[in-house]
């Protein structure tokens, strides 16, 4: 081999290695963070996110804390930023607790989005939102009203925590709707299970024991709703209406046994998928604005809405909300059609 030919081969090899290195560096990496791992709702959202990653050819990592805490989510956010991830999508346990970490991430060029539970809007670009507070709060009250067929009733609210963004927004709207449309309903208590299955069951049983004449439990939380249903079965209480939000796979046995007549949710698999598609579009296009539309395989078209649909005053370029196309009410007739 001549020296000239050796140098040529060496140069081509070096260029090839450099090209491979550039391709590896250019590959998008998106982190998808739940409030905590080990809950079917969040696992299903993660499955949708990873499905979208395969369709788009991007690397999606699903990981979260084992307990719902600001410190646990902040640690993950910082780790993903330090590892060079291009985008972070997080279901926030607090509206403001994650903001310092998320703002640092944005300063380093990381795209920050929220899903399921929002931060303050200035701490992210877009929120992939299951529904407005008015939509979801109204849905909760309407489900209860279909079963509580009297003017005077006693109602309890039961969900994850007093600080979580999404559920408190829904409950605020639900309580306002009750005051306006069902003034004879008395809200006797509002209690929390803190995303812990054991504590949620204990709390639900405590509510039913303390209020033996309770007419309805409204539980807009993936842990609280099945806990309320199990508590009613444990205490042989078949008079209380139990409604709220959780996944069909978790609630199926309670619906089949008649403990729960109906409950609601949205397709959380689609929510995870939409989240990654929006993040990918941001990474490729650079920005999106209110009114922009995005076609998503297997879902349809979604649109960027202003933050005002969520009741926020904050508006800025490259900032807004993407609403899921629809929400679902599950009952004995249709629950068999869903698997998540």
UniProtKB/Swiss-Prot annotation:
Keyword Signal: yes
Domain of life where this protein originates: Bacteria
Keyword annotations of the record: Periplasm, Signal
Record-linked Pfam families: Peripla_BP_4
Induction comment: In the absence of AI-2, repressed by LsrR. Induced by AI-2, via release of the LsrR repressor. In the absence of glucose, induced by cAMP-CRP by direct binding to the upstream region of the lsr promoter.
One of the GO biological process terms: transmembrane transport
Subcellular location: Periplasm
Signal peptide segment: 1-26
Main location: periplasm
Cellular-component GO terms for this entry: ATP-binding cassette (ABC) transporter complex, substrate-binding subunit-containing; membrane; periplasmic space
Keyword Signal attributed: yes
Function (record text): Part of the ABC transporter complex LsrABCD involved in autoinducer 2 (AI-2) import. Binds AI-2 and delivers it to the LsrC and LsrD permeases.
Assembly behavior: The complex is composed of two ATP-binding proteins (LsrA), two transmembrane proteins (LsrC and LsrD) and a solute-binding protein (LsrB).
Family according to the record: Belongs to the bacterial solute-binding protein 2 family.
Protein name: Autoinducer 2-binding protein LsrB
Organism: Escherichia coli (strain K12)
